[in-house]
């Protein structure tokens, strides 16, 4: 029996931000056509039991054929999710496209504009996305695509390790909050090694936010229980259950295809992943056999 896979497609590396904490630093500048990505999708489906494709970048909303590619995947009967910084999203886009996605994930490393500028999570003019704008976008997704799940990805570095974001997460009622430790990289003059966090600093950041989240969830459950008693309801009132996923180490735990169409393996060196399969030329099934994948870590992320 084939094992189910969720496959990350980094359809381009270009981005309108320059985040130092971004882990999508593969040194790939290629822009494959929609037809090429369709071939890769078909290759993946032929070689594995694919449960979902997760579209990422760079900033995937910069890709000119995004909607066409997503529709192609959906027509194959496979779910699609999107990871975005949200800067190019507006109400019209949400009305037209949000319903196509299983999950829309926003990359939010800080709710402080100055911290975002230090991280590089801003445009060339230094304009960052206000936290309130992400709240608005999430509200619009809830309005126009209520079945779409909302996820927040937060990458922790020395620049934001002391921040508590649980109140923000609570405000947008995120279904999932992924807290990741920043992946170190150094390509020529570009490096983030000076803003790494220690094991202890990362764990402290996670626990600080997890504890605040727990307190809020307990208070919410108490309020909902009181409402249920007052209403005399026979059936329990559904309470939001926010899932927090912590990733201190991303090695050997992703099935990831870069913007060149290559399946990458980062088990040996996280800073320099190795291409184990050109998915436009080789069978994806063969690439999977060569890929180092820690099934326990991989399945813990998605289950």
Model-derived features with residue positions:
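N-terminal pre-core extensions flanking Radical SAM catalytic domains
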Residues: 1-26, 248, 252-256, 261, ...
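Active-site beta-loop-alpha junctions enriched in small/polar residues
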Residues: 58-60, 85-87, 109-111, 155-157, ...
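Structural recognition of alpha->loop->beta junctions
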Residues: 92-111, 168-179
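Conserved alpha-helical substructure of the radical SAM core
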Residues: 1-81, 88-95
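A structural motif
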Residues: 49-50, 101, 147, 174
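Hydrophobic faces of well-ordered beta-strands that scaffold small-molecule active sites
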Residues: 5-9, 53, 80-82, 104-106, ...
